[in-house]
Regions:
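Tryptophan-paired
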Residues: 131, 234-259
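Short, positively charged
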Residues: 40-41
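Contiguous segments within soluble domain cores/interaction surfaces
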Residues: 68-111, 201, 208-238
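Cleaved targeting-peptide boundary
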Residues: 31-37
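Secretory targeting and sorting signals
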Residues: 1-31
Length: 300
């Protein structure tokens, strides 16, 4: 659920940053990166319709190659399909109602939505993508019924959810996940990576070690941008394009539940980027990025 943002004046500042990032993203097709595995489930999004090349999987390590044909739009990524499941005893409709709370303009309702999502659902990414920059998400899944859909583009926009049912059967193999970079999302609402210099074509292991859901968007910014400048921009309440914004493709992973690990393989241009999470704080409803959950990194 990309941009789990409050639709308030302050939040529009964040949209200005993300919107500039994707305005010219992925205008030309590119060859499939070498890390794309033909055995992975191919998840594609066109409009708000998500399709999957397979809907019955074996438990254990599974991979999903995520792409979109949606043109990049100011204010959001092109697509961010989410893999999720309700916990036992919670209906799918209840979990979708929780998501609607999370997208509320009212901070108290948004905070309630975060608490509800933490309680009622389990979230497993997937990816934030723009045309020409697919990503592959690899993770370990237990048997059960899952759903894939772009909740932000449907529930978040006041539209009915469009979902694909995924059935995971027993019998697969679970493998240890490793990547070029480890990045932890913490209970202090911070990103803690093993390094702030990443390969521009590589992989990271996203580990949610927090007590709440987090996602991580990777947004390009001008070289020399600092986290202090980004925080000052959020604090200012500005709604226009930030002075450090840069046109270019974005990447990242969608919402993950505490305790979940997923490997994301990506291919983005070299340069300076900022990691962002806009999930609403479960007490105040303030987006995590406004509270300091942003980190400038370099892709080389």
């Amino acid at each position: 659920m990309r941009h789990v943002l409050r639709r308030s004046a302050a939040t529009l500042a964040a949209c200005g940053l993300a919107g500039l990032a994707v305005t010219a993203a992925g205008t030309a097709a590119q060859a499939a990166p070498r890390w794309q595995d033909r055995s992975c489930v191919r998840v594609s999004e066109a409009g708000t319709t998500v399709t999957a090349s397979r809907t019955v999987l074996r438990a254990g390590t599974n991979c999903f190659t995520v792409s979109t044909t949606n043109p990049a739009q100011p204010g959001s990524s092109s697509a961010s399909p989410t893999l999720f499941r309700p916990v036992r005893g919670v209906s799918l409709n209840k979990l979708l109602a929780d998501a609607k709370d999370e997208f509320s303009n009212t901070p108290a309702t948004a905070a309630k939505g975060t608490r509800e999502l933490n309680r009622d659902g389990r979230f497993f990414g997937l990816a934030m993508v723009v045309p020409g920059h697919p990503e592959t998400v690899t993770e370990n899944l237990q048997p059960g019924t899952y759903w894939i859909g772009d909740v932000a583009s449907t529930i978040g926009a006041g539209k009915p959810a469009q979902l694909v049912r995924i059935t995971v059967l027993p019998g697969g193999d679970f493998r240890f996940l490793h990547a070029d970079v480890l990045v932890k999302a913490t209970s202090a609402d911070r990103f803690v990576p093993s390094t702030r210099t990443w390969p521009h074509e590589g992989s990271y292991l996203f580990a949610n070690v927090a007590d709440t859901i987090h996602f991580m968007e990777i947004v390009p910014v001008k070289n020399g941008t600092t986290d202090a400048q980004i925080q000052a921009y959020f604090n200012s309440g500005a709604q226009g394009t930030p002075p450090f914004g840069k046109i270019g493709p974005v990447g990242g992973n969608d919402v993950a539940t505490p305790g979940n690990f997923l490997r994301v393989s990506y291919d983005l241009p070299p340069g300076t980027y900022v990691l962002l999470c806009f999930v609403a704080d479960d007490m105040t409803g303030m987006p995590h990025a406004f509270m300091g959950m942003h980190l400038v990194i370099r892709l080389v």
